[in-house]
């Protein structure tokens, strides 16, 4: 199995803190104008995922999605979600913590790319079993 997204230890720790405050979360990586391409973190019930958004996987048991048009640029890379000092996105729940999520990446190896070509990413509309997910 090849993961499309992973989290650093610092990210896992911040997610744990945020879950205590906000409950179940979700992440969305967009190419939005306001917060650039920063990964945004939302309370799961507060954000409606687009039906064509791409499900990349989970980090610390929280689903991670990307806008379909962005995925066409990033599909050959493994995303590593990290945490750095700074102000989070305007609507992202980590904003008040003095930390922000940051996407790092690496290109998939040939072996990983071959595996993923046989296991395409799913769209949000095709998912079942993610409690509280709105599409």
Specify the residue positions occupied by each region the protein language model found.
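Domain-level signature for proteins that mediate thiol-based redox and metal-cofactor handling
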Residues: 1-135
């Amino acid at each position: 199995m090849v993961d499309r997204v992973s989290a650093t230890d610092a990210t896992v720790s911040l997610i744990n803190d945020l879950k205590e405050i906000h409950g179940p979360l979700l992440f969305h990586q967009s190419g939005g104008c306001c917060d650039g391409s920063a990964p945004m973190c939302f309370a799961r019930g507060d954000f409606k995922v687009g039906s064509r958004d791409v499900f990349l996987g989970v980090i610390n048991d929280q689903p991670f999605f990307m806008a379909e048009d962005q995925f066409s640029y990033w599909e050959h890379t493994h995303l590593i979600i990290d945490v750095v000092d700074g102000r989070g996105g305007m609507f992202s729940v980590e904003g008040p913590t003095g930390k922000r999520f940051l996407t790092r990446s690496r290109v998939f190896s040939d072996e990983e790319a071959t595996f993923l070509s046989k296991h395409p990413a799913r769209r949000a509309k095709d998912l079942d079993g993610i409690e509280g997910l709105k599409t």
